[in-house]
Design a protein with these regions (language model features):
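Transmembrane helical elements of multi-pass membrane transporters/channels
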Residues: 21-37, 143, 206-210, 214, ...
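Helix-terminus/linker motif at the lipid-water interface of multi-pass membrane proteins
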Residues: 35-53, 122-131, 187-194, 255-288, ...
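Transmembrane alpha-helix boundary and packing residues in multipass membrane permease domains
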Residues: 26, 30, 41-42, 78, ...
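Short runs within selected transmembrane alpha-helices of multi-pass transporters and secretion channels
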Residues: 73, 143-162, 170-181, 199-214, ...
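Small-residue-rich hydrophobic transmembrane alpha-helices
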Residues: 52-112, 151-170, 278-342, 373-396
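Short alpha-helical transmembrane segments in multi-pass integral membrane proteins
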Residues: 1-26, 80-147, 191-248, 304-369, ...
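Small-residue hotspots at the loop-to-helix junctions and early N-terminal turns
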Residues: 49-60, 137, 141, 200, ...
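N-terminal transmembrane alpha-helices
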Residues: 11-42, 46-47, 63-75, 107-111, ...
Length: 458
């Protein structure tokens, strides 16, 4: 018994080391990304509440597309991670190329569709918003949607690098891109007085730079990955099948899940500009609170994928359990720090007292419920790394459509609780999904999933 405890202790020591080494660069990256995003929102806030509302509305659309490609990138990340786990570098590089080319092709198609129907989409979703808000939203969407292929390239390449265990390179690229974003946005908004056009141009130029840099990194070659023979390419369905077996369910989950979030945004638009602006501000503050959780989600997918590639199912389970606990403790710590300043934070975005008061109340609720977030998001991120993407998809959709949307509408609209009611529906969704993911994790059936042909455990 003592010997088993010693072995278990040694194993956990290596797990902690792997998690910390992989997570710290992601954490630094997330901190910088969210901070720069908050600065951008603050700068837009000084254009006017109409600009904040327009950006919040358009970002709810952009986030659906970005989340779709982030989810598709998970397929490439998991497959590359599992090949790296097997030390099969040739297959890892081939999978990277397949994931990149196929995703860019899909992104170009989506960009063309969105550009053709952009005005109709805004009118359909947010027709009840003020005319000035809709006009600003049309300008912002027209510019930002042209960057979808660049975002896709950035997400796929950085995701694959993380899957290979390299989190420092994506961190450096993302930090540089976000610094440029703030510089461009400040120049266009505060110096050149371009208004909402400046906000859109700033983010578009920064994304272009980020995509170019990460592509150059892979063309030059990292420690294990290198993109070669760009003109020589044909689809390899033996590699695309495992990539899309993870990526497609994850993308469907993301599309329908974020589509549900968009529906809740439509509820909020009907509540008026104060609620729209408060929702955008609270989302921005919530993103800052949730930095540790988001970083550990990425680490969970990569590390579980690598262990499953080596057929180390127990190590995968121990790693995911440790990451989930670490995330929960980190989020509780963030919430405790934030609560005393919940009234001050919204003042960084606006001077409108009505928006400040509503934002403060929703932020307090967010901080109280955030400890539940880990079992709702970190656990399924690890399950996807093992290939259990279909279960996470179905569970997420149940939570979103039965609780966040239906209950959010009932609380927010029928019971007239407004924005607080809509967000309360989201917190109940977190709770239900978290319980379902926890049951799945404890049962252990996810360990039987096979994405690529496994090697014997070493």
């Amino acid at each position: 018994m003592l010997r088993k405890d010693i072995i278990k202790g040694e194993k956990m020591k290596f797990i902690r080391k792997d998690v910390i080494n992989l997570t710290l660069p992601i954490l630094a990256e997330q901190l910088f990304v969210i901070s720069m995003g908050m600065v951008n929102t603050m700068m837009a806030g000084h254009i006017g509440k109409e600009a904040v509302s327009a950006i919040g509305m358009v970002d709810s659309i952009n986030n659906i597309v970005i989340s779709f490609f982030s989810a598709l990138a998970v397929g490439g990340m998991v497959v590359v991670a599992q090949f790296i786990g097997q030390s099969n570098i040739k297959k890892a590089n081939a999978a990277m190329k397949q994931a990149l080319y196929s995703s860019i092709l899909i992104s170009v198609f989506i960009t063309l569709l969105m550009f053709i129907f952009k005005r109709s989409i805004l009118s359909f979703l947010f027709g009840s918003a003020e005319a000035e808000v809709i006009n600003s939203a049309n300008i912002y969407l027209s510019i930002t949607l042209l960057t979808y292929p660049l975002i896709t390239m950035d997400l796929i390449c950085n995701g694959i690098l993380r899957g290979a265990g390299d989190t420092k390179t994506p961190m450096k690229i993302t930090i540089f891109m976000n610094v440029m974003n703030v510089i461009f946005t400040f120049t266009f908004i505060n110096i050149l007085k371009f208004g909402i056009i400046g906000a859109a141009l700033g983010i578009a130029l920064a994304r272009s730079i980020g995509a170019f840099i990460v592509l150059c990194v892979l063309l030059k070659g990292s420690s294990v990955l290198k993109l070669t023979k760009l003109k020589k390419f044909k689809f390899d369905f033996t590699l695309l099948k495992p990539i899309f077996s993870i990526g497609v369910p994850a993308s469907i989950e993301s599309l329908l899940f974020n589509g549900g979030k968009l529906i809740t945004q439509v509820f909020i638009v009907g509540m008026g500009t104060i609620s729209i602006a408060s929702n955008s501000i609270t989302s921005s503050i919530g993103s800052m609170l949730n930095i540790p959780g988001n970083a550990l989600c990425i680490a969970a997918t990569a590390l579980v994928g690598q262990h499953m590639g080596k057929s180390e199912t127990e190590e995968a389970s121990d790693t995911l359990a440790y990451i989930t606990k670490l995330s929960t403790v980190s989020l509780i710590f963030m919430a405790l720090i934030f609560l005393p300043f919940s009234g001050l934070a919204p003042r960084l975005y606006t001077s409108d007292i009505n928006i400040i008061n509503l934002s403060r109340n929703v932020c307090i609720l967010y901080a109280l419920f955030i400890p539940i977030w880990s079992i709702s998001f970190v656990l399924p991120a690890g399950l996807k790394g093992a290939g259990d993407a279909k279960y996470t998809m179905v569970t997420a959709l149940i939570g979103m459509w039965l609780f966040r949307i239906t209950l959010g509408y009932f609380l927010g609209i029928n019971l007239n609780l407004g924005l607080i009611g809509v967000w309360s529906g989201m917190f109940i969704d977190w709770t239900v999904r978290g319980i379902l993911y926890l049951i799945r994790f404890k049962k252990g059936t996810w360990k039987e999933k096979q994405v690529i042909e496994r090697v014997a455990s070493r």
